[in-house]
Amino acid sequence: MNVDEAIRDLLNISTDIRSVAVLGPEGETIACGPGTASSGLAAAADRLWEAASASAAAADAAALDHIVVQDVAGAVAVLQADGRRIVALTGAQPAVGLLLFDLRTCLSDAFVEEDPA
């Protein structure tokens, strides 16, 4: 499965997600879809991640593997694994635990051929 197929599967199973982007190790967009918000997701996710990481470091907290910012209109979720990040925008009241599971699965599926056996 490639990254575009993994995103397509994610969007088919997770009805909460409105837009998603997969980011590479340098924060570059590898793939995204759908919607006009996708093009700006990488930069926004990078700024959000850096701010949250700095806050965690200042508090001597553990390194982050995900962040979720939620309000009445929806949520932004960023998850990091194996040097890559995935960011999603959702509609109102997403099931956050399921959302994070789906994002982790998408990221894993997108790069399954690169992972050591």
Language model region names:
Residues 1-25, 29-117:
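Non-catalytic interaction/Regulatory regions outside core domains
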